[in-house]
Amino acid sequence: MKVNLRKLMQLIVFFAHHEAVKPLGKTKLFKLLYFTDVTHLRTVGHPITGAEYLKYPYGPVPMQGNFALKELQKHRLIRQERVQITKTRFRRQITALQMPDMTIFTAQEMRTIHSVIQQYGEDTASVLSWKSHQESAWLFAEDWMPLQLAPEKHSTEQDEKNAEAIALLDQWYATPDDKPPGYWDDLLKEIETNRLQFRDEGLEL
């Protein structure tokens, strides 16, 4: 399926404009795009944007994603800026400068988009990265992720423990200076036990 750049770009503007997904960084955006295409594929039989996804350590990345972001910024539809979240941590934040054109999407596509926002919109980038790692398309892919593998999900008994560790990590990022002695060391031990790997959102792709 050929990528529909117009839909891809307007979907990016839509996510950047929607209050339910703010703040929006590049890692979170790329995972929302992936889950939108995968959800529509499972429901209807084909993705919305037709984008090809590459397998990166922190989840799927649309091959045309960076190009779309550059074009949107060039035409002043979005703004990308480096935002300081703590004394030492920064995040690349994406903000919409104009309203998206949603008339190009079908009613079924809009239902899919809103369902993705409802299900994933409040998740952080690290949580979405972990969730994308449970997808068969990510587990069995080498360099690029064929969405044909997407209808199946992979889950293990470790999933709940992983989710708890991610939630704790997100709590620490939210209030890094207000933790009791030993909290961070204990959290790192738990993450290591669960064999998870994280990265600061300030070092996004």
Whereabouts are the PLM-identified features?
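Short, charged, intrinsically disordered terminal tails
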Residues: 197-204
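Domain-edge interaction signal
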Residues: 1-156
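Short interaction-prone segments
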Residues: 155-194
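Short alpha-helix boundary/capping elements
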Residues: 36-43, 177, 192-196
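Generic detector of ordered secondary-structure context
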Residues: 7, 24, 64, 105, ...
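A structural signal for alpha-helix termini and helix-coil/disorder junctions
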Residues: 18, 119-123, 174-175, 193, ...
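Glycine-centered secondary-structure boundary/capping sites
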Residues: 44-45, 162, 199
